[in-house]
Amino acid sequence: MSSYKYYDLIRKPIITEKTTTLSEQNKYAFYVDKFAEKLTIKKAIEEIFKVKVKKVNILNVKGKKKRFKGIIGTQINRKKAIVTLEKDHNIDFAGGIK
């Protein structure tokens, strides 16, 4: 699979207070395509960030119900991947920020 398809597979990293504490344990969270599988997520992370992946966990996150001007709607359903890296590898999302 070419690298441009890997960029379509990994939607965006999840950067919250909870995920920054997970990064101390070499775990990083990403929103991924809802049809993505563990093996393809592992290959995509290794190709994009040039790191060695140890394990991938996947969660399906159901969209919340929201109300706007009396109209009830739902947010989209998402798939979340929590990627565990090998000991000597890490991903720096804030590279160059001072």
Curated annotation (Swiss-Prot):
Pfam families: Ribosomal_L23. GO terms for biological process: translation. One of its GO terms (cellular component) is ribosome. GO terms for molecular function: rRNA binding; structural constituent of ribosome. Keywords: Ribonucleoprotein, Ribosomal protein, RNA-binding, rRNA-binding. One of the early assembly proteins it binds 23S rRNA. One of the proteins that surrounds the polypeptide exit tunnel on the outside of the ribosome. Forms the main docking site for trigger factor binding to the ribosome. Part of the 50S ribosomal subunit. Contacts protein L29, and trigger factor when it is bound to the ribosome. HAMAP family: Ribosomal_uL23_B. Belongs to the universal ribosomal protein uL23 family. This is Large ribosomal subunit protein uL23. It comes from Rickettsia peacockii (strain Rustic).
